[in-house]
Amino acid sequence: IAPGFGGINLEDISAPRCFEIERALKTSLDIPVMHDDQHGTAVVLLAALTNALKVVGKRMEEVRIVVNGLGAAGTACCRILLAAGASHLIGCDKEGIVLMGDAEELRACRTDLQACIRRDQPRGTLHDALKGTDVFIGLSVGNVLNREDLERMNQDRIVFAMANPDPEIEPRVGDEASRIFATGRSDFPNQINNALSFPGIFRGALDVQASEINEAMKLAAAEAIAGCVPAEALSEDYIIPSVFDRDVVPRVAKTVAAAARATGVARRRIRIDDDLR
């Protein structure tokens, strides 16, 4: 089908098949291929965290981050956080802290993460991992945390409990026990929803006939989404724009198109400011 389409958006493919399928398609096709459960979620996560760190006055390269759930979305979130400058990241799954295990025992999709993380990590359970950390990112299952777990973290903690339909901690408790709290649900503030990212990413990629969606384009998309919240409006309950914000898609499209051109994957030359609507 590739000759008749400008891009392919993969949806609802479980790990580890999603990594293998996306890699095979990207290698064999000359049109953009993106698994939005991975990269769409990761882009919006980075946008939300960028703004959350501004609110609490912390820096990406200084904070200690726990990512719980290393499936499709969790693995992609780790990768984009590392690309954005995170320097202390702890990866957990149902077995606890897993990225510090023997490389030969890790799934293939995790060995590259292990090569990028710092070696001074704790060993043990998720609860051990939380001690002295600044950010919790949950992409796992509901109700794995309680108030005492969050109190093991540093002050001004940021908690993104993104499991659906039930977040990793009961929302009322999570909101009370953290400085900034976000979920994947629309009935609470700060919804982290991949619908904020993939329409604009593909719009920008298609407009310049990009041959791929690369890391620079995803980082640019995250920056554009974060920028849709004016600095003067940023607050604990407003770190990410609404999915109904009409400015998001065109703004993301323009920055993605510019990043595609800057990285040499755009095959159509257009005036970014004038031709992207």
Feature annotation, model-predicted:
Residues 9-12, 33-36, 67, 91, ...:
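General beta-strand structural signal in soluble alpha/beta enzymes
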Residues 12-15, 36-39, 94-97, 141-142, ...:
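Short, ordered loop/turn segments at secondary-structure junctions
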Residues 35, 43-137, 141:
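Glycine-rich phosphate/diphosphate-binding loop of Rossmann-like nucleotide-binding domains
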Residues 14-18, 22, 38-42, 70, ...:
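Generic structural signal for well-ordered, non-membrane alpha-helical segments
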Residues 110-180, 186-187:
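Rossmann-like adenosine-cofactor binding region
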Residues 1-64, 261, 265-268, 276:
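Glycine/serine-rich phosphate-binding loop and adjoining beta1-alpha1 elements at the start
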Residues 36-37, 56, 161-270:
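Adenosine-phosphate binding glycine-rich loop
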